[in-house]
């Protein structure tokens, strides 16, 4: 569909490459769910098909070229607008405002599937480019006024004699944007403090201190933990980023070379993977050393699935129990969300049940597996093994029966 769309513009020839990504505009959702009827109203907006907050974005680009195209499609594949980036010095016959508006009215549905008769012109403007070309901009508003101060709008621009953009969007009041920014700032402050507490106090303070004590007392057990950390960092960070290679070109600046951009991306992936390796290694070593000291009779985690241990009744019981506890944990999470939303006014925004961007990756099945791999290892080590084992050792050291398991 994107290839067919780009062929309608002479300035986008067959030599242009394409990249795609699934995009969501959350501004209208935030306004509607908080101020204008909640999730039911937002679902109604999606169903009436006047405005689509979910879209596939397809980019047509070429190395060294300023000219590029961005085509937008609804989830069902119908066209939902586009934007052609045209250089200021591009020569094209200039039109009067009346002729430019007539051109828009005649051709706007070529790459947009809305009903243009439901829109009224509310604003128009023009700008003269350095080469004398006249560019026009027209802003339309939908007749339906059922979302309070928010509005369904459509912007069309004409560069010379080319309709270079048709952009449907939702206008959200500036007052709400400021209010929402204040809400987000509180959440961001909490997140910053939590990250500081996690990295500064929990990981660096407790983790590094524990490693030093283990090393001095000969308790340090790290070889297999380091190998596990390297495995997780490689498969859950570096390779998962490489899996999204087709989508990274959405951020490519055509003013630079493709080789330079790709080198920068690869270096960033490797650097992030190395950083994650050190964090994982410190977490795994701390967890293994603590649990071996606190629970010397427990099965060592890295030997669980070895041939002479995996067939034991203890491993079978632990595995069955782990699966049986999953529905209990899911029920607790669900109950927490329901309690917070209904009784304490917490807001949980609506979102897709899955991320279609997985389909744009090289191996769609791999990303979910990689994320689960890291979460399963790291959360088990850092948020279960470390605090439980530390509590046991503290209890043994100070004879505190409440935390002496």
What are these regions, as identified by a protein language model?
Residues 1-2, 77, 104, 161, ...:
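Conserved structural-core and active-site-/substrate-pathway-adjacent residues in large, well-folded domains
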Residues 57, 61-63, 69-123:
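Long, charged/polar, surface-exposed segments that mediate recognition or autoinhibition
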Residues 94-114, 179-208:
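Short, solvent-exposed cationic patches
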Residues 149-184:
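Extended, hydrophilic extramembrane loops/domains of integral membrane proteins
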Residues 184-372, 378-388, 392:
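Core alpha-helical transmembrane segments of integral membrane proteins
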Residues 391-401:
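Membrane interface segments of multi-pass transport proteins and intramembrane proteases
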Residues 403-405:
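Conserved small/polar residues in nucleotide/adenosyl-binding loops
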């Amino acid at each position: 569909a994107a290839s067919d769309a780009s062929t309608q513009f002479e300035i986008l020839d067959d030599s242009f490459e394409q990249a795609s990504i699934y995009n969501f505009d959350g501004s209208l959702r935030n306004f509607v769910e908080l101020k204008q009827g909640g999730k039911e109203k937002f679902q109604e907006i999606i169903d009436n098909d006047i405005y689509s907050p979910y879209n596939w974005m397809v980019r047509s680009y070429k190395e060294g070229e300023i000219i590029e195209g961005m085509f937008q499609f609804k989830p069902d594949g119908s066209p939902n607008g586009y934007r052609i980036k045209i250089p200021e010095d591009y020569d094209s016959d200039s039109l009067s405002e009346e002729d430019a508006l007539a051109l828009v009215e005649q051709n706007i549905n070529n790459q947009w599937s809305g009903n243009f008769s439901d829109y009224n012109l509310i604003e128009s403007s023009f700008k003269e480019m350095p080469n004398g070309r006249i560019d026009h901009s027209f802003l339309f508003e939908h007749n339906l006024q059922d979302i309070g101060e928010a509005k369904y709008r459509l912007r069309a621009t004409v560069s010379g004699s080319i309709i270079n953009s048709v952009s449907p969007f939702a206008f959200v009041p500036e007052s709400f944007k400021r209010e929402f920014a204040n809400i987000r700032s509180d959440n961001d402050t909490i997140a910053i403090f939590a990250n500081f507490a996690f990295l500064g106090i929990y990981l660096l303070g407790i983790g590094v201190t524990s490693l030093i004590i283990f090393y001095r007392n000969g308790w340090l057990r790290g070889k297999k933990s380091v190998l596990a950390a390297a495995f997780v960092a490689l498969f859950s960070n570096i390779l998962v980023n490489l899996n999204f290679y087709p989508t990274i070109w959405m951020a490519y600046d055509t003013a630079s070379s493709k080789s330079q951009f790709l080198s920068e991306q690869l270096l960033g992936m490797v650097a992030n993977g190395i950083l994650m390796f050190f964090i994982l290694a410190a977490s795994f070593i701390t967890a293994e050393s603590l649990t071996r000291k606190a629970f010397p009779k427990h099965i060592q985690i890295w030997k669980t699935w070895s041939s002479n241990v995996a067939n034991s009744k203890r491993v079978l019981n632990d595995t069955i129990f782990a699966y049986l506890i999953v529905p209990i944990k899911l029920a607790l999470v669900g109950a927490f969300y329901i309690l917070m939303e209904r009784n304490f006014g917490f807001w949980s925004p609506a979102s897709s049940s899955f991320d279609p961007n997985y389909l744009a990756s090289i191996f769609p099945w791999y990303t979910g597996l990689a994320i689960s791999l890291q979460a399963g290892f790291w959360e088990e080590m850092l948020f279960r093994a470390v605090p439980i084992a530390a509590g046991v050792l503290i209890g043994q050291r100070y004879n505190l029966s409440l935390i002496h398991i």
